[in-house]
């Protein structure tokens, strides 16, 4: 039996429970119908959330995929009830509490390059600052 070799690793963002075959998946070179079925099954509890996904495609058209947590920027916009962040970091467009920022840091800890909640919180606070979201005590 031939050994499977990796042909491509792709990172794409899809809406939870709503993946459809399309150009983003076609370029990866996998069975799109099977992928969308498996992806939608795994993300049915996260309907409408943006889910980053890392797809590993193999030479025999098989694949593996890993689901990541929702991006910090989207979580911050949801917490501050915003459509989008500020055009520049000096313009304040919304506010969230420190408790909410800690909650986001705790949720994102598994995917961030941080070992502690405090380090993850610094990353979340930096993202909030760049988006024009003020963090209040």
Curated annotation (Swiss-Prot):
GO cellular component, one term: cytosolic large ribosomal subunit
PTM: One or more lysine residues are methylated.
A molecular-function term among this protein's GO annotations: structural constituent of ribosome
Record InterPro entries: Ribosomal_uL11, Ribosomal_uL11_bac-typ, Ribosomal_uL11_C, Ribosomal_uL11_C_sf, Ribosomal_uL11_CS, Ribosomal_uL11_N, Ribosomal_uL11_N_sf
Tagged with keyword Protein transport: no
Residue stretches in coiled coil: none
Listed GO biological process terms: translation
UniProt keyword annotations, A-Z: Methylation, Ribonucleoprotein, Ribosomal protein, RNA-binding, rRNA-binding
PROSITE patterns: RIBOSOMAL_L11
HAMAP family (UniProt xref): Ribosomal_uL11
Binding partners and assembly: Part of the ribosomal stalk of the 50S ribosomal subunit. Interacts with L10 and the large rRNA to form the base of the stalk. L10 forms an elongated spine to which L12 dimers bind in a sequential fashion forming a multimeric L10(L12)X complex.
Function: Forms part of the ribosomal stalk which helps the ribosome interact with GTP-bound translation factors.
Homology family: Belongs to the universal ribosomal protein uL11 family.
Name of the protein: Large ribosomal subunit protein uL11
Native species: Mycoplasma pneumoniae (strain ATCC 29342 / M129 / Subtype 1) (Mycoplasmoides pneumoniae)
Gene name linked to the record: rplK
């Amino acid at each position: 039996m031939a050994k499977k070799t990796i042909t491509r690793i792709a990172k794409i963002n899809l809406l939870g429970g709503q993946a459809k075959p399309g150009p983003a998946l076609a370029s990866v070179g996998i069975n799109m119908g099977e992928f969308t079925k498996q992806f939608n099954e795994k993300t049915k509890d996260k309907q409408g959330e943006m889910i980053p996904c890392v797809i590993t495609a193999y030479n025999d058209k098989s694949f593996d995929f890993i689901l990541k947590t929702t991006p910090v920027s989207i979580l911050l916009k949801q917490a501050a009830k915003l459509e989008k962040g500020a055009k520049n970091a000096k313009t304040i467009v919304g506010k969230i509490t420190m408790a909410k920022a800690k909650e986001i840091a705790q949720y994102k800890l598994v995917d961030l390059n941080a070992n502690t909640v405090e380090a993850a919180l610094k990353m979340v606070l930096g993202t909030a600052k760049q988006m024009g979201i003020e963090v209040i005590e």
